[in-house]
């Protein structure tokens, strides 16, 4: 059986003859192509680089501002402790919405939790998916968004709050003072805030239950969800 040669001695000095980083990167790309890549903990992978910053989120923010994504792949993650619960925030897409929206988006990484938070929340407390007189956007007046803004955001460590950016999106409108509607009728730009849930189109790459056109907005499917259910299916709690 042939053995693998990794070093050779020349002039009395042992030298590497293979590029470990390139080999590992090629392996990751191969796993991504086959939709089996489960991601790496970026805090571990880039520990020496992160040590030059106050924390891992200051580091990733600096990387994003410089548009330096070398060695960072869709599926990689940064752990966050929220209300004593560990949540692995995965890279869902890199510059997915760069230079889009009515207020052009700069360089960014969108993170989505690998699994669900154990605390559950009902999207709406009534069987009604409409906006109201204060806002025609169903999501913006939903019980879910209220919980994200007023409860879950409070669980974030300050080091995350200091770096997190808001997401802007073209959202569907569904409201009439005459009564409840079953389909959306228009759209408009909205600030989703620091925490949000992906749109149907961002997960499935198509509108299945929403209103064609209005529900899609300017959404694109995040790479992490493309052509596989590996990241679409999430457990209750870390590793659930």
Role assignments for model-derived ranges:
Residues 1-31:
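Short, low-complexity N-terminal tether/leader segments at secretion or assembly junctions of large
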Residues 30-240:
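Collagenous Gly-X-Y triple-helix signature in extracellular proteins
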